[in-house]
Each structure stands twice: as C-alpha cells, then as structure tokens.
C-alpha cells in the first residue's frame, strides 16, 4: 500500500498484519479520491476507524491541512504513527487511541470541526448511521462537510437525516457512499 498522489506520493505505507482489519486497496483509494476531486485547498480530516491511517494521510497529501486519525487498537495506532512519520510532517496529524464515541466526545470538547470524514467501521451498516448522526448532533461537521462511508458489497447504507448522498460507487467488493452535510 502506498500514497497515490500529492506531496507524499509514492511513499509506501505499513499495514496491519491482522485479519481484523481490511485496508482500503490502492485501487479503491484512487477511485475514491478521483471522485472527490484530485486535490484540495485546505480543510480538516477525521478518520474514525483509521487502521493504517492511509485515507487520512492521502487526504493531507492532496491538500487538506490536518487529519485526526482514530483507532481503538494499540497495534493500529503504532502502524499509523509509523506511517505519519513517513510524511516528515508529523505536526499535521494527530493519532488518538480510543473508541469512536470517546473520540467524538474529545473532539467536541475541543470544539473541532471537520470537512472530510472517513467511516469504515467493523459491523459497518449498523454503526455508520449512528456515528453520522452523532457527528451532526455534536456539531463536529463544517457546512457542506463530506462523509465517506465504506462497506462491503453486501451492506446497503440508507439515506441519513441531515445528509444528502452525492456519490454511490461499487468498486469490486467494496461499496462507497459519499454523503454531504445539508
């Protein structure tokens, strides 16, 4: 796995040696970012189930200002930190080892707001709608913020109150829906 484009392009990333995580493939990541827009002009990124940190690092590589990368696994957070070091710009990233709910509370208490959020949780279908609702209720999303929800091919994500679906892709065995805050 590697960074595909932007200032960190072609840098290889470490991945987790675990069956519990399924990193987003370079092909899916490339298609996803191509559909969002190749490059960005600032903004804040949140990845609540960061795994290796690849999506948040890719977003910063392509022009976002900073990313908060969250994972409950200590092993995942070690991998994320090693990948962040590869950027040589560690100050643009924050790694939180905690649950999604704890991260939301911490970030709300700090008054953080995000422009791009990645959601690829285990047990995706049940959790994504709840988390999107919490992000909205806790005022963590800027106006027109994008939420990228990734599931496997068998899960169907519904419409979510407060959001519009702006993109819906099936990329191999991966489904990706992009929601925009209303």
Protein language model features and the residues they cover:
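Class I S-adenosyl-L-methionine-dependent methyltransferase catalytic core
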Residues: 1-182
């Amino acid at each position: 796995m590697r960074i595909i484009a932007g200032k960190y392009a072609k840098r290889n990333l470490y991945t987790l040696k675990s069956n519990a995580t399924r990193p987003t493939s370079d092909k899916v990541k490339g298609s996803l970012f191509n559909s969002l827009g190749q490059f960005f002009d600032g903004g804040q990124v949140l990845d609540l189930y960061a795994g290796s940190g690849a999506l948040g690092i890719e977003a910063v590589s392509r022009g976002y200002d900073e990313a908060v990368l969250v994972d409950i696994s200590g092993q995942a957070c070690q991998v994320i930190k090693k990948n962040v070091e590869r950027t040589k710009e560690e100050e643009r990233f924050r790694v939180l080892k905690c649950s999604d709910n704890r991260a939301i509370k911490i970030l709300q208490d700090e008054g953080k707001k995000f422009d791009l959020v990645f959601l690829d949780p285990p047990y995706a279908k049940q959790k994504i709608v709840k988390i999107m609702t919490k992000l909205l209720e806790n005022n963590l999303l800027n106006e027109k913020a994008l939420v990228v929800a990734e599931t496997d091919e068998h899960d169907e994500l519904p419409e979510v109150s407060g959001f519009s679906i702006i993109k819906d892709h099936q990329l191999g065995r991966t489904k990706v829906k992009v929601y925009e805050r209303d």
